[in-house]
Amino acid sequence: MLTPPINLHAWIEEHRHLLKPPVGNKCIQQDGFIIMVVGGPNARTDYHYDEGPEWFFQLEGEMVLKVQDEGVARDIPIRAGEVFLLPPKVPHSPQRADGSIGLVIERERLPTEQDGLQWYCPQCNHKLYEAMFPLKNIETDFPPVFDRFYRSPALRTCSQCGHLHPAPERYATVEG
């Protein structure tokens, strides 16, 4: 049975209170594609690795999509009204401004595919840590990987330059 159309603007107004940290992300449909509305602000330091493409449509405000492009860190600004198709297998870290709202569309993963979360040294861009896993639910599969990385000073210390990657405030007791 077909689902009825969604009035996206009305959906956003009704759910705007959910599009804030710490999650800021709500899946509105999932049937072949994962269609999410994502609000800012956020302060992610991880890079997401997806074996498929991702489509970004910035509805309100702006964002910067940090990417690792052939070993070089780059910033791609995406402003309200703009769309961007990220090719498969490009590590990316969406940085959303306060009050911003975007639509992100990813295809559902094939049974053989894995997602990844990666962290790079903010000083020298050396890859610090990578975890690959089959993605079932973006809202529940990411947090254990975040916890593993941020709770471990060993994982966060760069083997190239010795810099300790900062952890979010909620992990502050790990370093104390």
UniProtKB/Swiss-Prot annotation:
Cofactor(s) demanded: Fe(2+)
One Pfam family named in its UniProt record: 3-HAO
The protein's assembly and partners: Homodimer.
Keyword tRNA-binding listed: no
Record-listed Fe cation 2 binding positions: C121, C124, C158, C161
Residues binding O2: R44
Protein name: 3-hydroxyanthranilate 3,4-dioxygenase
Cofactor note: Binds 2 Fe(2+) ions per subunit.
NCBIfam families: anthran_nbaC, PRK13264.1
Encoding gene (name): nbaC
Binding site for Fe cation 1: H48, E54, H92
Function: Catalyzes the oxidative ring opening of 3-hydroxyanthranilate to 2-amino-3-carboxymuconate semialdehyde, which spontaneously cyclizes to quinolinate.
Source taxon at top rank: Bacteria
Binding site for substrate: E54, R96, E106
Family per similarity comment: Belongs to the 3-HAO family.
CDD domains, per the entry: cupin_HAO
GO function terms (MF aspect): 3-hydroxyanthranilate 3,4-dioxygenase activity; ferrous iron binding
Enzyme class, UniProt record, top EC level: oxidoreductase
EC number: 1.13.11.6
